[in-house]
Amino acid sequence: MHFPKKKHSGNLSVVELPKEALQDSLTAAQITFKRYAHPNGNAGSAERPRHLKVESAPVVKSEPSLPRMRQPEPRSINHQYSRETLPGHSEAFSVPTTPLQTIHYDVRNKASNSPSSIAAAETAAYLAHTNSFSNRSSGVGSRDPVMDTETKPPRAPSALKNELQLNRMRIPPPSYDNNVRSRSISPQVSYSTSLSSSCSISSDGEETSYREKSTDEAFPPEPSMSSYSLASKASAKASLTDPSQRQQESDYTAMNKLNGGNIIYKGTLPDLIPRSQRKTSKPRFKHRLLRSPEQQQENLSRVYSDQTQNGRAIINTQQNVKLKTTMRRGKYAITDNDETFPYDRKSVSSDSDTDEDSNVMEIKDKKKKSRRSKIKKGLKTTAAVVGSSTSVLPFPHHHHHHHQLHNPNSHHLHTHHHTSSHKFNEDKPWKSHRDLGFITEQERKRYESMWVSNRYSYLRLLPWWPSLANEDDESHLQPLNLPQDGLMLNLVVKDIWYRSNLPRDLLVQIYNMVDTRKDGTLDRKSFIVGMWLVDQCLYGRKLTNELDQRVWNSVDGYVLGTINVKPATSDHYHNANNPLDKPSKLSVRQELKNIKRDLRNVRI
């Protein structure tokens, strides 16, 4: 005879029952059925009833002498956990972790004649009868090696279910009196009946085990244990402990790692997330970002307030380690209202606060310093320009140009550029561009350096230069009228000007404008003016047909008090030859605009 596989609702472990335990359970079920089927003592009747009826069930009275049940041999834990496969059948058996609650009530309340005890006893007898009758075709000793899966146990009568529902509230709590326990049926009977009831056949989807339907509705659930050995040991020691101690043990087993691991450590170890809350502690990423700090504080207070209500074990260590910084946010962050951490929390947030404040202060100081330096530079340049002793211009707004002409380091003091000083960049000459109409001192020095380094080069290539053959004949030598500063060959000038990448026709036009000797060479003045015209073309100015005399004069001397005012022919007071005469109204307006623009550029 074989029992089918039944998966326990509480624990998912499947354990095969040994052959000796199967035989003992079947024997106990048969004895229990015979006893309750024939209460008058006719236990030896050959024919057994097929169904039990609650209406005609006789009242079982407590008898002084009860039949002694055969005690099974004690087995060790390793023997109970051993798996044995029956021949011809590969399925495993599922053993319940705890005995049925109805069987405990029947064993412990055997002496009482209450209808609840009678109903519980009849339920156990019915379960034993259905399993033994459906699976056994011959005597107790003879068992079929092959299980017939098509046979189904008869359904429980409706009267028995109604009686269980009526007596649900009248079932007394289990008593742990040693006298009553000694006069009741031995624990092997309850063990066998619970085993047989849990091993019922469940082939169809609509037909489930009787234990899940009846016991869950009629009796309150108890914390089940996760192994067969633990259940047997706990039932053996139940009578030796008081109810308070049993409650503590049940709480401990419920809090143990075998049943979820709801143990919270505090002190040296951080707060561990319980296994039951891991799914709920990982919400969506959107809710994490959009969650307000008030909700985080509520979640934190709820977690610490539910520790004692849920009966979780809190392990407080003696060494309370204070961590200054942490990466954990949300409901696991430390707050001022949290009483579970006794140490001071001021130093926890002091590091981050001081770092942020110091960074902000440093940025503010840098901004203030940069602004102060700019104001100081503006004041210095303004004082240098206004306080110059060489300012003899007729109009006060022309002091910029006057200072630029006499101060070689003041090329940055103009209305179109910043006040910060910078050197001339040959690759970017337009950054130092000023539309003055003449050559400044800095430009002249730059051009003169190129003149000095390239003059007197390759002059022997000239046709009019005396050759080496004529040097021996001193009578035919004629003195050369060379300028004091020297000469530069036109081929050298062409090579230098080609570096500007200007069009060739434009360079030819510039050369023709500055060539005064007409002998294939350029003197110092022509070379400097030609270089200045090349730079003006690079700055974007158009080349004029004639050069102003101021440009030629600025090569050898300084230009003082130059006013760029175009003569107006409509004004009869203006004389082009006298720049100090009364200007026109249009020029006055233009000068006022220049003054206002200069005042805006000066940063005070």
From Swiss-Prot:
CDD domains named in the record: EH (cd00052)
- Keyword list, A-Z: Lipid metabolism
Q: How does it assemble?
A: Interacts with INP51.
The keyword Membrane is annotated on this UniProt entry: no
Residue ranges of domain EH in the record:
469-559
In the record, biological process GO terms are:
autophagy; cellular response to starvation; fungal-type cell wall organization; lipid metabolic process
| Descriptive protein name | Protein TAX4
Q: Which family does it belong to?
A: Belongs to the IRS4 family.
Query: Record's GO cellular component, any one?
Result: phagophore assembly site
Query: Misc remark for this entry?
Result: Present with 396 molecules/cell in log phase SD medium.
Q: Which residues cross the membrane?
A: none
Q: Which organism is it from?
A: Saccharomyces cerevisiae (strain ATCC 204508 / S288c) (Baker's yeast)
Q: Where is the composition biased (Polar residues)?
A: 176-185
Where is the stretch described as Disordered?
38-77, 132-249, 267-299, 338-380, 394-428
Q: Which SUPFAM superfamilies does the record cross-reference, listed alphabetically?
A: EF-hand
The Low complexity compositionally biased stretches are 186-203, 224-240
Which spans does this entry mark as compositional bias, Basic residues?
276-290, 366-379, 396-421
SMART domains, per the entry: EH (SM00027)
Superkingdom to which the source organism belongs: Eukaryota
Record Pfam families = EH
Function per UniProt: With IRS4, acts as a positive regulator of INP51 activity and phosphatidylinositol 4,5-bisphosphate turnover. Negatively regulates signaling through the cell integrity pathway, including the MAP kinase SLT2.
Alphabetized InterPro entries for the sequence: EF-hand-dom_pair, EH_dom
